[in-house]
């Protein structure tokens, strides 16, 4: 033990204990392509063992934003890692990639082994859901950088897809149908607005909310869905033209990212069930419907675009993995995102 280092605020023994606690969770995530164990300077992946003709790597990086503030307030850290994995992996999925591996970065003012284990257990659970290996990460203890009990988390995901199967939305055309997959709730975006509403109303995250049938904190901390199994099922049909992950910026910012120039989509907001958490935020926060769709996912976390004649085939593939797809929109030969009942 370095006494002077500990006097400076860094407890090496706590860091070692945290890593030791993490190992059993990391072990759950391993894939046969992984060549190194936890603790190696760099993680190595054997792409050759996948026998692909022309593999394309697809990467994504993200964090969880101010949703962390809720985890701090409620001392609930078990699912925030799932959020981190979801935010990165879902972005890779839209290009047709199979998630391969994930790395995390956790920064805190003081290493607390039990808390760090809970966070990484969530990361590992997210990796299991996504089918990717947690091959490494960094836990940085930085005295003076964060308030007591707080931390930040970010992640980095890499997936792989055959070049000929790469999805970039370029084949989407007028008349295509957009299928929407349900979100679990707010996911990991818009929490600065959520927190503003809660604080302005003088509410607490432990308050029971009748409309939500649970506490406010429980409803808001539901982890972001990981759409790996659904995306794989849809892609297996060979009929997917493009996909989108609905994150910060809601419908208006994320949907255009999958569309070729000159095309737009008209959505029917009545074509999927409304989630109580969004109804509550809209009412209590006095937020316009248009702004809600510009900030939140509004109950749709992932979109899949297919030809009209292929809708039933893709729906059936999704149903086989327990996923219900909603026919929520149609591609049109005029730019822009339009939502019936919202845009006037």
Swiss-Prot record:
<dbReference type="GO" id="GO:0046084">
    <property type="term" value="P:adenine biosynthetic process"/>
</dbReference>
<keyword id="KW-0547">Nucleotide-binding</keyword>
<dbReference type="InterPro" id="IPR004733">
    <property type="entry name" value="PurM_cligase"/>
</dbReference>
<dbReference type="InterPro" id="IPR036676">
    <property type="entry name" value="PurM-like_C_sf"/>
</dbReference>
<keyword id="KW-0067">ATP-binding</keyword>
<protein>
    <recommendedName>
        <fullName>Phosphoribosylformylglycinamidine cyclo-ligase</fullName>
        <ecNumber>6.3.3.1</ecNumber>
    </recommendedName>
</protein>
<comment type="similarity">
    <text>Belongs to the AIR synthase family.</text>
</comment>
<dbReference type="InterPro" id="IPR016188">
    <property type="entry name" value="PurM-like_N"/>
</dbReference>
<keyword id="KW-0963">Cytoplasm</keyword>
<keyword id="KW-0436">Ligase</keyword>
<comment type="pathway">
    <text>Purine metabolism; IMP biosynthesis via de novo pathway; 5-amino-1-(5-phospho-D-ribosyl)imidazole from N(2)-formyl-N(1)-(5-phospho-D-ribosyl)glycinamide: step 2/2.</text>
</comment>
<dbReference type="GO" id="GO:0004637">
    <property type="term" value="F:phosphoribosylamine-glycine ligase activity"/>
</dbReference>
<dbReference type="InterPro" id="IPR010918">
    <property type="entry name" value="PurM-like_C_dom"/>
</dbReference>
<dbReference type="Pfam" id="PF00586">
    <property type="entry name" value="AIRS"/>
</dbReference>
<dbReference type="GO" id="GO:0005829">
    <property type="term" value="C:cytosol"/>
</dbReference>
<dbReference type="Pfam" id="PF02769">
    <property type="entry name" value="AIRS_C"/>
</dbReference>
<dbReference type="GO" id="GO:0006189">
    <property type="term" value="P:'de novo' IMP biosynthetic process"/>
</dbReference>
<dbReference type="GO" id="GO:0004641">
    <property type="term" value="F:phosphoribosylformylglycinamidine cyclo-ligase activity"/>
</dbReference>
<dbReference type="GO" id="GO:0005524">
    <property type="term" value="F:ATP binding"/>
</dbReference>
<dbReference type="InterPro" id="IPR036921">
    <property type="entry name" value="PurM-like_N_sf"/>
</dbReference>
<keyword id="KW-0658">Purine biosynthesis</keyword>
């Amino acid at each position: 033990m370095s006494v002077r280092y500990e006097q400076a605020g860094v407890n090496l023994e706590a860091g070692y204990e945290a890593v030791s606690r993490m190992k059993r969770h990391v072990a759950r995530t391993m894939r046969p392509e992984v060549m190194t164990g936890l603790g190696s300077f760099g993680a190595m992946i054997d792409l050759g063992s996948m026998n692909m003709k022309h593999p394309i790597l697809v990467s994504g990086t993200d964090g969880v934003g101010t949703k962390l503030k809720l985890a701090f307030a409620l001392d609930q850290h078990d699912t925030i890692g799932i959020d981190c994995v979801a935010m990165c992996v879902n972005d890779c999925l839209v290009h047709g990639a199979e998630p391969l591996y994930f790395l995390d970065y956790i920064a805190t003012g003081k290493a607390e082994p039990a808390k760090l284990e809970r966070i990484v257990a969530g990361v590992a659970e997210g990796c299991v859901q996504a089918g990717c290996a947690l091959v490494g990460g960094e836990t940085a203890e930085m005295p003076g950088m964060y308030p007591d009990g707080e931390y930040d988390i970010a992640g980095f995901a890499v997936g792989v897809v055959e070049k000929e199967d790469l999805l970039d939305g370029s084949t989407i055309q007028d008349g295509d149908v957009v299928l929407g997959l349900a979100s679990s709730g707010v996911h990991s975006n818009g929490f600065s607005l959520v927190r503003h509403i809660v604080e302005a109303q003088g509410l607490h995250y432990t308050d029971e909310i009748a409309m939500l049938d649970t506490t406010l904190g429980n409803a808001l901390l539901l982890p972001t869905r990981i759409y790996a199994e659904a995306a794989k099922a849809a892609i297996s049909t060979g009929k997917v033209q493009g996909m989108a992950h609905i994150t910060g910026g809601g419908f208006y910012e994320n949907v255009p990212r999958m569309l070729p120039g000159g095309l737009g989509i008209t959505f029917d907001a009545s074509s999927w069930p409304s989630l109580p958490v969004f109804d509550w935020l809209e009412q209590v926060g006095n937020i316009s419907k248009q702004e809600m769709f510009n900030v939140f996912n509004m109950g749709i976390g992932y979109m899949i675009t297919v030809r009209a004649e292929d809708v039933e085939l893709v729906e059936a593939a999704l149903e086989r993995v327990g996923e219900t797809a909603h026919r929520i929109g149609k591609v049109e030969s005029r730019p822009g995102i339009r939502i019936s009942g919202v845009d006037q």
